[in-house]
Amino acid sequence: MKIRTPVVAAALYLAAALPAFAQQAPSLYKRLGGYDAIAAVTDDFLGRLSTDTQFSRFFGGHSADSIKQLRQHVVDQLCAATGGPCVYTGRPMKTSHAGLGITEKDWDASVKDLVATLDKFSVPAKEKDEVLTMVSTLKKDIVEKP
């Protein structure tokens, strides 16, 4: 019985320490600053797109309510994709962008605007790369023309 006591004590000590070892790294959502930070980045990014002459054909003629809905969908999508608590309820990207005639040139310009936004908010390189990698997976569903 005396031999088991140190073994049990050691096992209990290790078991108590396990939660510290099991902790995961913070999600991209948390590292970006959470919901408010993602919303601010979205506002800046959509502002850049809406004032960029290359994208005027996509934003012209939309009501303020339509733009608000687009904004919320983008916030929810980024929030969910980065590990946050949001749920994206919008349409699939392919459906949302079908028929818009988005080109490679449009894609490249939008990525440039996104990088400028991330730089404005001083997003660290690691997180910026993660966001850009995540966004790049959407390209196949958004770009319709070379």
Which stretches of residues belong to each language-model region?
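Low-complexity, Gly/Pro
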Residues: 3, 19-22
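Core of compact, soluble alpha-helical bundle domains
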Residues: 22-146
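Bacterial N-terminal signal peptides that target proteins for export
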Residues: 1-10
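Bacterial N-terminal signal peptides
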Residues: 9-19
